Each structure stands twice: as C-alpha cells, then as structure tokens.
C-alpha cells in the first residue's frame, strides 16, 4: 500500500502544557537537538520517501512556518493554515476529499521512536490492497483514554472516556484488564470520507473513526514500541529523555 500524503495536526494550543506553550506551539517544544514536529517530519521523510507532507497550523502558526522554512524548497512541508481552527475531524475530511489520496494522519503532539515509526510503516507497506489503518497500543482499562473494539484485526468501534471517567478510580479489575487504545495515527484510504460531514471543532475520535469502522474497512495495527502522547509536563519530560536516547542509538543528525 502506498501513502500519498502525510497530514500532521499541529493547530492546538497545548493548554495543559503551559507555561511551556506560552510562546511556542506545542509541536515546536524542544526534544534535545530537535523538536516534536521536526522529529515527525524527519521520520516521515526517512520511512515514507516521496509522500508529500502537510502541517495543519493555527496557534502561533507563524512560528511553525518559520521553522519549516529551514527545509530545502523541494522537501519543505506544505502549511494548511487556519486562522479559526476547524478542528481535526473537519481539517482531515477536507484534506482527504480534496486530494482523494491515501493519507497518513498523525497528531502533532506524538513522539515515536525511530523503531516504532518504522514498524508502523512496515505494517502499512505489507498491505496488498488499499485500506484504512488505526495504530493502537494496549493499556490498562483504567489508564486508557479511548477504547477500541476489534474482531479478527478489524476495528468495530472506538469510544472515548469522559473527563469524569478519566479522573475517577475504576478499581483493581480495570488496572489489570488490558484494552486497545488509539495511538494518535491513522491511515485513511482514498475516498473513505466523501460522504462524511463532520461538525466543526471536534476530534477524529469517535465520529470520524467510527464512520470508517462502520464500513468494515479499518484495520488495527499494533504499536508495541515507544510512543508518547505529549499532553502534560510529565509526558513531555519523558519524551525529552527518550528522544535523547533515540538520537544516540540511531546516530541521527537534525
């Protein structure tokens, strides 16, 4: 299966990461010698050569634009700038329907090790026919933000926990019970969203993901490696530490 374009969602304000995001968009937070966004761009270029890269920007978009101007003109990502953020579901739907391509969508607050990213791409490349793919990892039911239901590798549905459910203690049984949870990356097969009409300012999950799942065309790809959703100080500092180790291990230069 060929990925034609990559869309990195980086329009959010990163409110839970203040004061780090007072003067920087979340995707530009430093990771030692690189930053969150640049890490995703470099991995995309390395493991998916030839795929065009798009970045959705809004909050402090000028700083993201300035950052990508460091790339040579022929390799420079395209910016999808939204003065008034549309929300991930509408942005992704518009991009997929305008390009009519196989699109890899990545949340711009994700840190993947090189090994994890390469394994995901390998799973995509092994697909003989075009299909939609959701990257998922296993977590305890108590800690999971989303719960993915699958049958024989085909995703049936996804549900999101409410803020109340996330803060409540669910007890010992939920700590030991493992569930599949979304890892912040999805491949959307061409023409999958033609008749999908999302509301403004909503996330990809659950509505967009369930729309694709209802067609029985959404495969689960297991994420067993290092991946961090950077949405608070603890996760950010963990990503900084892991990024330093990853750069040494793979001798990467940014």
Q: Where do the protein language model's features map onto the residues?
A:
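Conserved beta-strand termini and adjacent loop/short-helix elements that scaffold enzyme active sites
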Residues: 56-58, 80-83, 134, 161, ...
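Catalytic-core segments of class I nucleotidyltransferases/pyrophosphorylases
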Residues: 104, 111, 118-125, 139, ...
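Short, high-confidence coil segments that cap the C-terminus of an alpha-helix
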Residues: 50, 100, 128-131, 216
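Short, well-ordered beta-strand micro-motif
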Residues: 30, 135, 148, 187-189, ...
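Short catalytic helix/loop segments, enriched in acidic residues and glycine
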Residues: 23-38
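A conserved hydrophobic helix/loop-capping motif in glycosyltransferases and polysaccharide synthases
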Residues: 6-11, 27-30
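Short beta-strand-to-loop element that shapes/binds the nucleotide-sugar donor at the catalytic cleft/hinge
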Residues: 59, 132-149
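Conserved N-terminal catalytic core of the sugar/cofactor nucleotidyltransferase
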Residues: 1-8, 16, 34-108, 112, ...
């Amino acid at each position: 299966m060929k990925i034609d374009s990559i869309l990195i969602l980086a329009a959010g304000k990163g409110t839970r990461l203040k004061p780090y995001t007072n003067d920087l968009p979340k995707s530009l937070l430093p990771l030692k010698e690189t930053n969150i966004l640049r890490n995703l761009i470099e991995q995309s270029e390395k493991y998916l050569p030839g795929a065009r890269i798009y970045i959705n920007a809004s909050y402090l978009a000028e700083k993201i634009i300035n950052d990508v101007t460091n790339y040579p003109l022929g390799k420079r990502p395209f910016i999808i700038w939204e003065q008034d953020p549309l929300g991930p579901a509408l942005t992704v739907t518009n991009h997929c329907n305008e390009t009519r391509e196989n699109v890899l969508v990545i949340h711009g607050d994700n840190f993947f090790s090189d090994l994890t990213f390469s394994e995901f791409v390998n799973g995509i490349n092994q697909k003989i026919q075009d299909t939609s793919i959701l990257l998922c990892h296993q977590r305890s039911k108590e800690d999971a933000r989303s719960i993915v239901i699958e049958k024989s590798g085909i995703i049936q549905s996804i549900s999101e926990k409410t803020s109340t459910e996330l803060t409540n203690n669910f007890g010992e049984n939920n700590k030991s019970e493992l569930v599949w949870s979304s890892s912040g990356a999805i491949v959307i097969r061409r023409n999958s969203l033609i008749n999908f009409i999302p509301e403004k300012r909503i996330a990809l999950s659950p509505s967009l993901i369930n729309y694709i799942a209802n067609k029985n065309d959404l495969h689960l790809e297991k994420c067993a490696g290092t991946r961090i959703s950077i949405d608070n100080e603890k996760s950010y500092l963990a990503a900084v530490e892991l990024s330093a180790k990853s750069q040494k291990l793979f001798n990467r230069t940014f």
